[in-house]
Amino acid sequence: MRYWSIRDEDVIDLVKRRYNVTISADQIAKARGFEFRISWKKAIETARAIRFLTIKQAEDYMEKVKDLKAPIPIKEFTRKQAHHNVPWDGWPVAKWPVKVADSFLQVLRNLESNASYRGLNIDNTVIVHASASRGMRIRNYMPRALGRATPWFQDTVNIELVAVELPAELVPKKFSWARVLKAIK
């Protein structure tokens, strides 16, 4: 059995500390995606970038990343990474992970469906928890000369998103790069 990395009580406590609002377990929607064949490092950075956005803002952002119109800021895995001209100030390391954005879009659409099924207002639903963890390792071997073989393993990634319906005055109205950079710092 697979367990969530965050419990409902922890989500309620997180919302209480961040937004100073008391919510119930009925205002929480969750979605998971298992074993996507994507980069684990890029998935962590993408999860960090979409946290504290609404579901619609996160979907629009992932669509822009897929179309190579908006980059994902890279915070942790910056060694030997290119520095680009980016639409924000003071953070030059960025990437355009298309496969990761496509995988996150699948989970975001599932989260939107789960939230509407639970009766939550999609416009007021904010992602409060986004995580990417390593999944199963797919073992492959590349045949070499003289009967040898080289391991050619492939890692997979599990994606987990939790969203909460907040009061309308606490919901971010529009997408801003400053909020994305503040969330990843």
Curated annotation (Swiss-Prot):
A cellular component annotation (GO) from this entry: cytosolic large ribosomal subunit
Coiled coil: none
Pfam families assigned to the protein according to its UniProt record, in alphabetical order: Ribosomal_L22
Record carries keyword RNA-binding: yes
GO molecular function: rRNA binding; structural constituent of ribosome
UniProt cross-references to InterPro entries, sorted A to Z: Ribosomal_uL22, Ribosomal_uL22_euk/arc, Ribosomal_uL22_sf
Gene Ontology BP annotations: cytoplasmic translation
Keywords, in A-Z order: Ribonucleoprotein, Ribosomal protein, RNA-binding, rRNA-binding
Cited function: This protein binds specifically to 23S rRNA. It makes multiple contacts with different domains of the 23S rRNA in the assembled 50S subunit and ribosome. The globular domain of the protein is located near the polypeptide exit tunnel on the outside of the subunit, while an extended beta-hairpin is found that lines the wall of the exit tunnel in the center of the 70S ribosome.
Alphabetical list of NCBIfam families matching this protein: PRK04223.1, uL22_arch_euk
Family: Belongs to the universal ribosomal protein uL22 family.
Quaternary structure and partners: Part of the 50S ribosomal subunit.
Protein name: Large ribosomal subunit protein uL22
Species this protein is from: Caldivirga maquilingensis (strain ATCC 700844 / DSM 13496 / JCM 10307 / IC-167)
Taxon lineage: Archaea, Thermoproteota, Thermoprotei, Thermoproteales, Thermoproteaceae
